[in-house]
Amino acid sequence: MQFCWIGLQIEAKNAGAVVLRRGFSTKICMSRRRKCALRILETYPSADYTKKPLFFAVFWLRMQHISDRIEQISVLQAGLNETRRLFMQKSFGFDTLQLHAGWRGDSATGAHAVPLYQTSAYLFDSAQDAASQFTGELPGSIYTRIANPTVSVLEERICALENGRATVCFSSGMAALLAAVLTFCEQGDEVIALSSLYGGSFALLFGQLEHRYGIRAVKIDSEDLTGLAEAISEKTRMIYFESVSNPLASIADIEAIVTTAHENGVPVVCDNTFGTPYLFDAAANGVDFTLHSTTKYISGNGTSIGGCVTDLGTFEVSGSPRFPQFNLPDAAHHDRVYADLGGGAFAARMRDYFLHDAGFCMSPFNAFLTLLGLQTLSMRMRRHVENADAVANFLADSPYVEQVNYARLPESPYF
């Protein structure tokens, strides 16, 4: 014989309907709780359940299936914990990660798909709990401008695919680029960028950055890196390039860029939008940070705008003379010293300044749509490559075409 405590608080009885405020101690479906409440009504029909204080009934109920349900939930939770442990070890392949990373299921409902948490704010257990989360002492969702459960799943999933340390999502790829630059740079600092870039990125770096923010962008020829080492100065805060440039599809000498940058203590930031984590493993090639316009291949369905920046865990700002903003107390954010956060320094500062303060946040709905597209990334990229091969070879054989820029053609300098 097994028993289970059921707690029921009845708010109203109207034409046989029962409204329950709260059930506790077990994870029993609402229909089961409603049946229990009706049994109380049948036992005490004369009680007035509508007056305050609300009637509170606790009783013993012999129900074998409830105990079985609790046991099932315990097994499910153990399985979810094991899944989380395996994902943290990154022991799964790319296809599995793009489907499951960042989401362990909903233990409260049993839902296996990622829900759309379309909410602006969240509930707190107490005023102290809210204060601790707002100051960053405790983790949690406090406001969707800063963090949202749906967006967080997308961040964790992209981070797993990039084999990174932390990812922050933004409202667009351009917002992600500006956030990355302004996280590393203060007025008077410099950014080195290769010349072959997406038009919007080129306009921001070489047309707006110095004029509006006092940050100088130094341009280096993508096809000739001989001037890269000489261009690095005490003011240099990052070197920026695209893994596969948009739209010329040129490929820089990544090994030379990484070697030169690290010899001078400068982080390497790669726009991996065209390469994607599937075609280009930035971490394995020495890159320190990646960014994406998730609008393009990450999403793949043309329905959502977004961007992200991922810290790949290879560059440390602690004690670096190039980055005093990470090593000094930040009066604007509770005197936080970001370097003290270790591996979370870059993501935390970016989230504080560009989500909390500036509102560059990705909407939950865009994150939800992006997650749907991300599930097929590997299959889509394989087909993209097959299609691009066919088109490039067709054009290369055409007497009406003078030049084809495609790295997989034998005559390409990047082949």
Predicted regions and their residues:
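Short, positively charged and aromatic/hydrophobic N-terminal segments
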Residues: 9, 26-27, 37, 44, ...
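N-terminal glycine-rich, Lys/His-bearing helix-loop that initiates the first secondary-structure elements
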Residues: 84-138
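Conserved PLP-enzyme active-site core in the AAT-like
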Residues: 90, 98-107, 167-397, 405, ...
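Glycine-centered tight turns that cap/initiate beta-strands
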Residues: 163, 400-403
